[in-house]
Amino acid sequence: MQSWTPPTAEQVDAVIARIGHAEQYRHFFERNNNPLWLRPLAERGIFKTPPEPVQVDWSSSPLHAVWPASRYLVRMTEHDPQAVLDIVRAMPDTGNLTMRRDIVDVALAMPGRVAAQLVSRMVPWLREVNDATESFFSLSDGLGRLVAHLAREGETQSALRIAKDLLVVSATQTPGDPGSYVPHNRRVKARCSSWEYGQILTRDVPVLVHHAGLPAVRILIKQLKSAVWIVRNSGGRPEPDYSMIWRPTIEPHEQNLAHNDDVTDQLISALRDAVSTLVTDGTLSLREATELLEKESDPVL
């Protein structure tokens, strides 16, 4: 086992005096691999000043600077997860997306019972980000991985709590076709890119379904119902259900017209696989699975 030397008060004072300069600040945290510095630095307030997003040009997105201190926390988590947890819980949230992604990485490196204590801090982030910045910082990708991590560690309630917000779909409007009576079209969008959404559904949700069972399936049903409602009302007024045209078969088939990046189609496949898993592992009988889906009014279900 590796051993570390705790810093003396004089060493801490010397570092505090030196890291007022940006380059030395970065150099110290990039080179420091000693977890025994965590609490002395925290006691001096070093982790209380994360950088805020900076709006350089009002025509573009804010800049979210990398924070060397939070990268240090990520590296130290495996050595002292409790100390890192205490520090992160005391840190102010400035809205800096690089820092938020670092906190997700911290949680991914923690035992599930420790990481679960950060979930209440993370869930509100999903309601704030926009598509452009979110995709760049991959916050949803990290949270998807955290859903799977928590589920594997037995923290299914925390995993479900993230998944409920992570998988939410909504409508976005685009201009209607020229000359059409429909002024705009509505389509289904996720809180992240459709590619990332598909990755979460195929990589992380199956783990959640395996460990959490029916509650995970109900999340998928709810979001698929929302997606179908958006599709059926895409022209501004209710339309017939055409799912038998764009998704005629439940299994992958060339007859299916929807694209792989279509959120509604992704949800159909994810729900199909989730229900199949519960039937295979004996959680649901085939009859119970059929009744679960048939009680919903949407033809696609």
Predicted stretch roles:
Residues 1-301:
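Non-catalytic all-alpha helical scaffold/repeat segments
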